[in-house]
């Protein structure tokens, strides 16, 4: 029997104290979801447990099942709401999550990853994945390797867990557009369908971040690209026994919260309505082959890993050199410091700086290097297996 799915995803921008109009926006989001026909909701950046509990209580009548993925220091910020029962839940935390000393970015403290809720609807199983990849922040993008390996880890996780499901949905803020390496990895490896390419009625252009219609968008970014960047996505993968028709796809929210002069979030929402139905004729189950295009994508990913490891080795040398020089200075000036509180504070600061450089060049370097090696060897193993398989079939 055919069935409908109506999925909704939104990066809520829910940083306590920092995010503007947070309380009013959560109230508006809850009101919209109460009145909507969405059956599955994936939210990101719900950083406060209090906000999650508010949403949970507000949506208990139409979306009675929910799960928040606790992780890291602040929590992952990810939660899923469902009309139907959640049979299983699991969270996979990524080994690379930014840098602890980049406090103003905060990704490391969130302990980000990908959450899975396996939803049971009658005798059907629906895998719902919710995720939020590392942000870019700057054009030089020092987090490219982190985000790329997060994408690969997510793609492999989806690829290895979709088996029992009739349909699998990946929703969230990927911080990557259709042409980006991370997006290619996520869509080509499992593989996943981008409904934007399937919906003939879709509006063009269609952005979800830094859009002219969003009150929180950076005016400088809007001038460069008024339609914004499409970095929030809903992607899906079907069991071979099923097919799906895209009924509706786009941003379901108005530009402003009704009666207010601000938007629901600094990102636009995305919704997808699917009609899922069994294939009319008997199907021959076959293995879904990963296209040759992913070979090029994997090669690019390996190159990014290699460059990141080279840069990391250079950083190690810099950190240890600076840390060593500071340590020599501290040892060499023992007994020469005046007995004063001010100088004691200065010594304490310099000592802390010394420890920072030495730890970054030793412990943190090993953690990041091993994470990069893990991703690199996995990608190399994938490419090697693909080559050997092609040789065997020729």
Placement of each model-derived feature along the sequence:
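Structured beta-strand-rich core segments of catalytic domains in phosphoester-bond hydrolases
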Residues: 2-4, 12, 21-22, 34, ...
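Active-site beta-strand/loop signature of hydrolases that rely on acidic residues for catalysis
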Residues: 6-12, 25, 29-55, 81, ...
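Short histidine/acidic/glycine/proline-rich micro-motifs that form metal-
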Residues: 14-16, 72, 176
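Glycine-rich, phosphate-binding/catalytic loops in enzymes
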Residues: 25-26, 57-61, 97-98, 145-146, ...
């Amino acid at each position: 029997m055919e069935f409908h799915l109506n999925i909704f995803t939104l990066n809520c921008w829910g940083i306590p104290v920092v995010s503007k109009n947070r309380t009013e926006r959560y109230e508006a989001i809850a009101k919209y979801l109460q009145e909507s026909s969405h059956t599955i909701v994936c939210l990101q950046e719900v950083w406060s447990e209090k906000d999650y509990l508010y949403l949970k209580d507000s949506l208990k009548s139409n979306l009675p099942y929910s799960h928040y993925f606790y992780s890291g220091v602040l929590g992952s910020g990810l939660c899923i709401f469902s009309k139907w029962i959640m049979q299983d839940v699991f969270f996979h935390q990524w080994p690379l999550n930014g840098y602890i000393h980049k406090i103003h970015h905060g990704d490391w403290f969130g302990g980000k990853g990908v959450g899975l809720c396996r939803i049971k609807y009658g005798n059907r199983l629906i895998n719902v994945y919710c995720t939020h990849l590392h942000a870019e922040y700057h054009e030089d993008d020092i987090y490219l390797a982190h985000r790329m390996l997060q994408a690969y880890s997510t793609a492999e996780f989806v690829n290895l867990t979709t088996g029992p499901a009739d349909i699998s949905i990946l929703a969230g803020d990927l911080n990557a557009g259709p042409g980006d390496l991370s997006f290619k990895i996520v869509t080509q490896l499992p593989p996943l369908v981008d409904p934007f390419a399937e919906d003939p009625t879709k509006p063009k252009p269609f952005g979800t971040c830094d859009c002219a219609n969003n009150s929180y968008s950076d005016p400088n970014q809007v001038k460069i690209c008024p339609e914004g960047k499409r970095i929030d996505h809903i992607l899906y993968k079907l069991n071979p026994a099923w097919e799906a028709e895209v009924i509706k796809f786009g941003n379901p929210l108005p530009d402003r919260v009704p009666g207010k002069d601000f938007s629901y979030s600094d990102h636009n929402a995305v919704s997808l309505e699917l009609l899922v139905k069994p294939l009319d004729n008997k199907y021959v189950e076959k293995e879904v082959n990963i296209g040759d295009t992913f070979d090029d994508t994997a090669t690019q990913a390996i190159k990014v890993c290699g460059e990141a490891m080279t840069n990391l080795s250079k950083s190690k040398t810099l950190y240890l050199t600076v840390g060593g020089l500071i340590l020599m200075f501290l040892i060499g000036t023992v007994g020469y410091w005046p007995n004063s509180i001010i100088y004691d504070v200065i010594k304490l600061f310099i000592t802390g700086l010394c420890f920072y450089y030495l730890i970054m060049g030793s412990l943190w370097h090993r953690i990041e290097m091993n994470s990069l090696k893990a991703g690199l060897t996995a990608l190399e193993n994938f490419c090697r297996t693909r080559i050997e398989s092609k040789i065997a079939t020729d």
